[in-house]
A protein has these predicted regions:
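Short loop->beta-strand "edge-of-pocket" segments that line small-molecule binding or catalytic clefts
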Residues: 1-11
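Beta->alpha turn/N-cap motifs
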Residues: 9-11, 30-32, 48-55, 101
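Aromatic-rich, solvent-exposed beta-strand/loop patch
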Residues: 10-19
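Short helix-initiation/N-cap motifs at beta->coil->alpha
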Residues: 12, 27-38, 74
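Residue-level signal for nonpolar/aromatic packing positions in well-ordered secondary structure
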Residues: 17, 39, 44, 78, ...
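Short helices/loops that flank or line small-molecule/ion binding pockets
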Residues: 19-20, 32-48, 52, 60-61
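Periplasmic-binding protein-like
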Residues: 51, 55-111, 114-123
Length: 123
């Protein structure tokens, strides 16, 4: 089809596009920055990426636009074997304590993504 999409290799959206997109060529690169550079240099037609970074690009160049509906949602999770209540309890306490103690919030601030990602509320 002649359509080329820049994508950060091994990202969640790379996996999704690989499984679901059949009529375009994925151009895989080693960093998010490299994928954005390919797009800015007109070496690809489309840039796949996370919405906050795409919004940053749109603010810098009013010739860019973004589809409004995301094509996938990234939901992170942890898997354990059934019948391991002590492991489930450990993971739940670990996550809950790190949220309550502010560690997760401090990591978001450290990486300057506190306005881009959210933390679930813990009772």
């Amino acid at each position: 089809s002649g359509i080329q999409i820049a994508v950060f290799e091994r990202s969640a959206y790379d996996l999704w596009l690989t499984e679901n997109l059949k009529k375009a060529e994925l151009i895989r690169v080693n960093s998010i920055e490299e994928s954005h550079n390919l797009f800015k240099e007109n070496k690809v037609n489309i840039l796949a990426g996370l919405k906050p970074k795409l919004i940053e690009e749109m603010k810098k160049n009013n010739n860019y636009e973004m589809i409004q509906s995301p094509f996938t949602y990234i939901k992170q999770s942890i898997g354990i074997k059934k019948g391991s209540p002590e492991v489930l309890d450990f993971i739940n306490k670990f996550i809950s304590n790190n949220i309550k103690e502010g560690y997760i919030k401090s990591l978001l601030k450290q990486h300057n993504v506190q306005d881009k990602l959210s933390i679930p509320k813990i009772n």
